[in-house]
């Protein structure tokens, strides 16, 4: 499946656990990886439920940072990706709710 961020087409590939695409640069294993060069997000196909959604959101956050040329240290990038993956839905849901109330004149 594919999606577009800032005009760049990305794809998501579900791969077997332990797949070489799930290796970090330091050689350690992961359950998700965002490859800017290939414009591909690789996710361990054994994931499911809320954890799968959080890993997907985390990796899409990396894709957005690459697509918008947002440069951070590794630690900063991971912090932002983790925050959005864990709490982004709640933040956007609240913002949407407040925005709708303001538009209707309830403020």
Task: Show which residues each predicted segment covers.
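Active-site recognition of the HExxH zinc-binding catalytic motif
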Residues: 54-66
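Metalloprotease/metallohydrolase-associated module, dominated by Zn2+-dependent proteases
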Residues: 1-51, 67-107
